[in-house]
Design a protein with these regions (language model features):
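Cyclic nucleotide-binding regulatory module and flanking cytosolic helices
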Residues: 1-27, 76-79
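Glycine- and acidic-residue-biased ligand/ion/polar-headgroup-sensing regions
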Residues: 28, 39-52, 67-69
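Short phosphate-coordinating micro-motif centered on Lys-Gly-acidic
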Residues: 30-36
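Cyclic-nucleotide recognition modules
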Residues: 62-122
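Short helix-to-loop capping/linker segments positioned immediately adjacent to catalytic or ligand/cofactor-binding
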Residues: 85-86, 106-112, 131-140, 158-161
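Phosphate-/nucleic-acid-contacting segments
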Residues: 144-147, 151-207
Length: 207
């Protein structure tokens, strides 16, 4: 979390220094859209957000699903003049705190709490890079089945169980893996018939 190791009594002062703004988004709303210029980073307080890449014809690919405690837009907030190459959506609604993190980077006399925040920010960015590297492994698989097996295997490892719940519905999972939804649904049925998995909605069991 961005505020790990920071005392509750210090968080309010840090938020004030970073000009924190709280926003609540309804279901199926956009937080930011492709091409916008942003000056703040978003910190997810409740529910989750999706980072989306959209092509000229409006086809979407979910790059990431970020839940509570995750940060987004920090790179654009630091660069300032670079337009967004992604969109950020709240399909299930979301509560977000926006932070002017460039104030943190520009400060020459940071408090201990702000130094801790900067440390946590770097850790979150490193975790994001690790996640994107893992996603590249899914996307480089040649077939839909290979992509599904790679993704479900990684989820089982992360959840430390062969019974797992994924954060996507069918369309979202297809968008995340960059495959056709109908083809993916058919492949899931074949994988179940082949005795590899059992599933119901977004609950899976690896056999």
């Amino acid at each position: 979390s961005l505020f790990r190791g920071i005392a509750k009594t210090e968080i309010a002062a840090v938020l004030q220094n970073l000009d924190a703004q709280l926003r609540v988004y309804p279901r199926n709303s956009f937080i930011w859209q492709l091409g916008e210029q942003v000056t703040t980073a978003g910190f997810v307080v409740a529910v989750s957000v999706h980072i989306l890449r959209e092509d000229y014809w409006g086809r979407q690919n979910i790059l990431a699903q970020l839940g509570c405690g995750h940060l987004f837009g920090e790179v654009y907030a630091c660069l300032r003049q670079v337009p967004l190459t992604v969109s950020v959506a709240a399909p299930n609604g979301a509560t977000v705190i926006f932070l002017d993190i460039k104030r943190l980077l520009a400060g020459s006399a940071r408090s201990e709490a702000e130094n801790r925040l900067l440390h946590n920010l770097l850790l979150l960015m490193a975790e994001r890079n690790l996640f994107l590297t893992q996603k590249m492994e899914y996307l480089t698989k040649r077939t839909t089945r290979e992509k599904l097996l790679a993704y479900l295997s990684e989820q089982a490892r992360l959840q430390q169980s062969n019974k797992l719940t994924i954060p996507f519905n069918r369309q979202q999972l297809a968008d995340f893996l960059a495959v056709d939804r109908s083809a993916m649904s058919g492949e899931l049925s074949k994988m179940q018939a082949d005795g590899l998995i059992r599933y119901r909605k977004n609950n899976f069991e690896l056999l």
